[in-house]
Structures are given as C-alpha cells and as structure tokens.
Amino acid sequence: MITDTVEINRRPEEVFAYLDELDRHGEWQSQIESVKVETEGPTRVGSRAVDRRQVPGGPRDIPYEVTQHDPPRKVSFRGVEGPVRPVGTVTVEPLDDGSRSRVSLEFDLQGHGIGKLFAPFARRQAARQIPQDQVKLKERLESGA
C-alpha cells in the first residue's frame, strides 16, 4: 500500500470539487495522456472512466470505477479490467477551521493473472510518481485551478 499526504491552501470543498472532475486528472497526474469519462452526470458511486496512461511498454487504457463517494471528504476507486488494477481512497480533511485542506491518498496496484508478476514493479514506480503528482495537485489548486 502506498500512502501520501499533501496540505493545500484551499478549502476542502474546492479541493474535492476539483478532484471530482475525473476528466481533469491529467492536469496533475503526469502519466495520464487522456481521460474518457464513460458515465454521464456528476461523479457518484458507479461512475466510470478510462485513463490512457503512459506506462513501461507504451500507452495503456486503465478503466476504473468510483466505489465510494462522500463529498467533500472521501472518494474511493478500483480498476475494473487489466492485469494490473489500481485501487485507492482519497480523503480530504479540513485544516485551520476549514480554510486549508489535507489530501491523503491510500493507493495500491493489484495484479490479476500475469499481472501478479508486474504489480510489484508497477507499485515501486507508482511510489516514486505519486509524491510528484501530489505536489502538482497542490501547485495547480493554489494557483487558482
């Protein structure tokens, strides 16, 4: 399990609203080349999207669904296809009477079939990338996104 936390000088409601826009995840997650949201309407339990990510071996589509949605505090997701599938939870906590936020990520990559061989490598790569992406998220939100 990979965990990472970042503090952001924005209200939790604003942070969660930005995270809730699945099609904007490529603005702060550097491996994402594109996002296709497959479910119409606001994000909710059961919402699905496909991230096209640059991974070793070339671009790969990573389909996932939202499994928990508790605005403005928590969202969980899980991959639904592929040999290596993401699973995670993002929690947004208020700081300083709600004027700032702490964003905590719990994340893992689960191997299925042949993916059990690749998951440890992918997990190590994600452990290096996630802190950088969290910094980009902070910078993006604090600059007015």
Regions found by a protein language model. Name each.
Residues 54-60, 111-114:
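Short, cysteine-centered beta-strand-loop-beta hairpins and adjacent loop/turn segments enriched
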Residues 1-44, 145:
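Hydrophobic ligand-binding cavity/cleft-lining segments
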Residues 8, 55-57, 70, 81-83, ...:
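A generic beta-sheet turn/junction motif
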Residues 78-132, 139:
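Beta-strand/loop substructures that line and gate deep hydrophobic ligand-binding cavities in soluble
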Residues 47-54, 75-81:
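Short beta-strand segments that buttress and anchor functional surface loops
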